[in-house]
Amino acid sequence: MNNDFSRRDFFALLGAGLVAGAAAPQAQSGKRLFAYVASWTSGPGIGVGNGGGISVFSVDMATGALAPVMRTGPEFDRMNTGYLAVNPNGRFLYATNEVESYDNEYGGGAVLTFAINQVDGTIAHAGTQPSMGVWPAYISIDASGSRVAVANHGNYDPSVRVVKKNGVPEIEKVWDDGTVALLPVKADGTLDRPSDVAILERTQSVDKVTQRSAHAHSVNWDPSQRMAVACDKGCDRVYTYRVANGSHTLAEGKTVKTEPGIAPRHSSFHPRLPYVFIVNERQSSLSCYRYDATTADISLVQTMPTIPAEYTMNNSPADVHVHPNGRFVYSSNRGHNSLAIFRIDEGSGRMTLVGIVPTQGATPRGFNFDPSGRFLFAANQGTGNIVTFAVDGDSGTLTPTGAKVDVPRPVCVQFAAV
């Protein structure tokens, strides 16, 4: 299979008997596990292959291998799929179309609903809503499956207007708003129009290219569903919101001004303890924060580097995930092309480096664990592949399984058992 995995490739494999829904592997629950992979069409460090849309794979839980099931049709080839979220009921997949004008009306990006076929894991488009911002970079869903949150990144370049002040013409620069939008999930599983939108502070930070305005890059829910955390890499802010169960509003919590220039990007909550881990894109570091879901308070515990001290070339961390067992946290490095592994002290939240492992590809923009935590799947955007690693739950170490699949410009991996 070449780097440009297409529908033609899929049907060739089908004819060869290599893609068969009836032969899909069994997940631990007795259901079959499927992986859903987002592909970019445009963005920094674009990568290999003609990207766009979403690819579906069956997961062999004995080996961690991915077998192609389908790729979205030609109507989605221009869909710049930035991030994915699966409804906890396993019946719906939500995706961002990370563009500035999904409808050619310059009204920002979009969020799409796909219904997951409960027999073979395939997906079908079921609805679209505006994301309430430009370049929606992230989407997440709460544990009840009733609310979706979207982080809208905004452009790096401003719009330029000419205004007259006291009769004197002047140039005025207007940047897109960085926003966090909340969308209710309707009874049929599709998304309703946004019920609330938080507009991030219109300010700037250190870097004169990437930090001239707010850039919301992620928003995630704490396990109790009472608090959400949004990362603004443009202005070095971490925002918390109170989101009581059943509420469809974003009540302002606390705003943390991080160290200038570090660019907080993605977050991952500990499954049981009051810690959230945030990766910092411009500092090549990972921070642990302690939080109180009732008050939405948050405070810094520790920050650790994600690359070796002797590495001096360009690097920008991208993704972060706490292992399902809660003992380890992992971060991906674009540039060093690796995964940093840290052991978590459950009493304090402090991290100890376990090791740094190459991802066997370039630009690992995203990665994820299967729900059991047995395997880690690294999405190497730059080389257009997903590499499988076996996870040692006791030591946290990663071992390549030898399983690798070509996917055009992969940026996010999510799972559903059907």
Q: Which residue ranges define each predicted feature?
A:
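A short beta-strand motif characteristic of beta-propeller blades
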Residues: 69-74, 125-129, 204-209, 252-257, ...
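Short, conserved, GDST-rich strand-edge loop motifs in beta-rich repeat architectures
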Residues: 38-48, 96-107, 153-174
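Beta-rich, blade/repeat-based domains predominating
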Residues: 78-88, 133-143, 202-224, 258-275, ...
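Short loop/turn segments immediately following the C-termini of beta-strands
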Residues: 40-42, 98-100, 153, 233, ...
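Asp-box/WD-like beta-propeller blade repeats and closely related beta-sheet repeat scaffolds
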Residues: 124-216
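Short loop/turn segments immediately following beta-strands, especially the blade-tip
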Residues: 58-64, 115-121, 183-191, 242-248, ...
